[in-house]
Amino acid sequence: MLRYLSILFLFFSSSFSNAEIKDKIIQNLKNTDNIDFKFEQNINGKIEKGNCVIEYPRKIYCEYAKSNNKILVSNGKSLVIKTNRPSYYHYPLDKTPLNYILDKKFLIDEIKSTKERIVDGKFINFKILKEENVINIFFDNKNFNLIGWQTIDVYQNLNITYIHSLKINQILERNTFVLPKQN
């Protein structure tokens, strides 16, 4: 009998801790208006680094280090990738996986209804399936902050983004998310 009670206790205590994890992640997201961070991005083995700012909902500005002054900007509706080579790519944001990653309300709703997975005891992962997109979102197991994502990009490349050195709710310049003009 004691063995059965122990098993029940372990089952309910682990369920509570899983619910508590989700609650902490959701609370962190609710309290976050923007994040400034450094990133390392691996697209099919090609590593790029840089700095980004995300402002919820759906805005992002990234400067890539050592890559022809590459920038990535979303104003909430469109996504532009520009380099000084010159190349200029313009996409409707809603046709990219970033549309979901940059939508805090969407993330919160998905986290509420998705089973989390603990990876190596360090990371909390939510696998989100939406409109033919598979999006893996990762959070830190200690502070419950966003630490990265994995998607398939518009060219069908595996894209893994790790973020670090987060600064939350910084004062941002008004024109940060203005789309650059084509040369």
Show which residues each predicted segment covers.
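A short, Trp-centered hydrophobic/proline-enriched beta-strand micro-motif
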Residues: 27-47
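Extended beta-sheet lipid-handling architectures
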Residues: 34-37, 49-52, 62, 161-163
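An acidic-aromatic
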Residues: 52-100, 159
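A generic structural motif
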Residues: 40-42, 63-65, 82-84, 129, ...
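A charged amphipathic helix-loop-strand protein-protein interaction module that recurs
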Residues: 94-113
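Sec-dependent N-terminal signal peptides
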Residues: 4-13
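Boundary at the C-terminal end of the N-terminal hydrophobic targeting segment
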Residues: 16-19
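Gly/Pro-enriched, hydrophobic low-complexity segments
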Residues: 109-110, 114-183
